[in-house]
């Protein structure tokens, strides 16, 4: 089985220990269903997805970075520890949050860049992706009469 180790973005580092698959990812677990579905599809294709703290980096066939890390040295160190792994950058956040994520000079260390900016895609190194917005509904819906209202 091929192994892909995922490094969550700096804002979601609490999702290590594979929590990105069971507690969701981003604000209020917004992408939990999407990441769980991704993991299931990958497993069916013979690919194991785990956060990068679950196995030695040396064992990875690919290292998947969710957004650029704060330090370029983090990418270089990962490359040194897993020299045969493919390095993938998934640009997850918008240019408002991380404009530097979109600068090509910041992509030099990566073999593949996944972006939702279709203008950049060449279907070789730069590839397009669409992450479905899959919010989860609460397990129990409180009756309307039991809800409290708040106003600012």
Predicted regions span which residues?
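N-terminal pre-catalytic "stem/leader" segment of glycosyltransferase-like enzymes
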Residues: 1-84
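Catalytic core of nucleotide-activated saccharide and alditol-phosphate transferases
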Residues: 72-152
